[in-house]
């Protein structure tokens, strides 16, 4: 059975400031660096063999810290990037106009073809993150990969594995540097394919972490 671990990046400056990041970027805070070191210690105990990361700066830095602890190289995969939030990226969440807030709500509430101008839909996000996960099945037998990605992207991935719509990600609380695990299994009695073992574990962190509504 293939076990794949999913880690959200450490806290960033814009997480703390409640700015919309999307595929724009801000550096990890000192707290985010500490979170990454704590999740790295946990990852080392798990016997991780491969680290596959979004190529955005905040995930790169988180992955570098984990890789140093695990002694692994990093593979960067743009399919693990966060949802493209278009013209709303870099904006403070409380500064949105009524029209802009409607764009955001249509996107996260699952309105058909909902998207922010110049951004992408939840279905487009789902297609690419699920394709990235599926690529893990091509790794050598006995591999135990860890994917470093983003809150909405990972929430979307876990939701769709559970058979929920992509926009159901908002019902999951995946805090900074939380660990989730999904397994690929072939079983006559249990669900074949990808199953969710755990989601949003933060037992390795020594202080509260921000959730997606606080980014």
UniProtKB/Swiss-Prot annotation:
Pathway: Carbohydrate degradation; glycolysis; pyruvate from D-glyceraldehyde 3-phosphate: step 3/5. GO terms for molecular function: phosphatase activity; phosphoglycerate mutase activity. The keyword Cytoplasm does not apply. Substrate binds at residues 8-15, 21-22, 58, 60, 82-85, 104-105, 151-152. Keywords: Glycolysis, Isomerase. Its EC number is 5.4.2.-. Gene3D superfamilies: Phosphoglycerate mutase-like. It catalyses: (2R)-2-phosphoglycerate = (2R)-3-phosphoglycerate. Transmembrane segments: none annotated. It is an enzyme of class 5 (isomerase). It comes from the Bacteria. The record marks 150 as: Transition state stabilizer. InterPro entries: His_Pase_superF_clade-1, His_PPase_superfam, PG/BPGM_mutase_AS, PGM_Phosphatase, Phosphoglycerate_mutase_GpmB. PROSITE patterns: PG_MUTASE. SUPFAM superfamilies: Phosphoglycerate mutase-like. GO terms for cellular component: cytoplasm. The active site is at 9 (tele-phosphohistidine intermediate), 82 (proton donor/acceptor). SMART domains: PGAM. NCBIfam families: PRK03482.1. PANTHER family: BROAD-SPECIFICITY PHOSPHATASE YOR283W-RELATED (PTHR48100), HISTIDINE PHOSPHATASE FAMILY PROTEIN-RELATED (PTHR48100:SF1). Belongs to the phosphoglycerate mutase family. GpmB subfamily. This is Probable phosphoglycerate mutase GpmB.
């Amino acid at each position: 059975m293939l076990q794949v671990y999913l880690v959200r990046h450490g806290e960033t400056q814009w997480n703390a400031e409640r700015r919309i990041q999307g595929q724009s970027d801000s550096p990890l805070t000192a707290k985010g660096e500490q979170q990454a070191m704590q999740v790295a210690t946990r990852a080392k105990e798990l016997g991780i063999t491969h680290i596959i990361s979004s190529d955005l700066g905040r995930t790169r830095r988180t992955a570098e810290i984990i890789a140093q602890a695990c002694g692994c190289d990093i593979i960067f995969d743009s399919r693990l990037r966060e949802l493209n939030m278009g013209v709303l990226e870099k904006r403070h969440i409380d500064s949105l106009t009524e029209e802009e807030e409607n764009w955001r709500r249509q996107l996260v509430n699952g309105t058909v073809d909902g998207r922010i101008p110049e951004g992408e839909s939840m279905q487009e996000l789902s297609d690419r993150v699920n394709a990235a996960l599926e690529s893990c099945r091509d790794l050598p037998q006995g591999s135990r990969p860890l994917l470093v990605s983003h809150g909405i992207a990972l929430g979307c991935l876990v939701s769709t594995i559970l058979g929920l719509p992509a926009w159901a990600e908002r019902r999951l609380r995946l805090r900074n540097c939380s660990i989730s695990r999904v397994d690929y299994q072939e079983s006559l009695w249990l669900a074949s394919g990808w199953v969710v073992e755990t989601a949003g574990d933060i037992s390795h962190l020594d202080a509260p972490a921000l959730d997606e509504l606080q980014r």
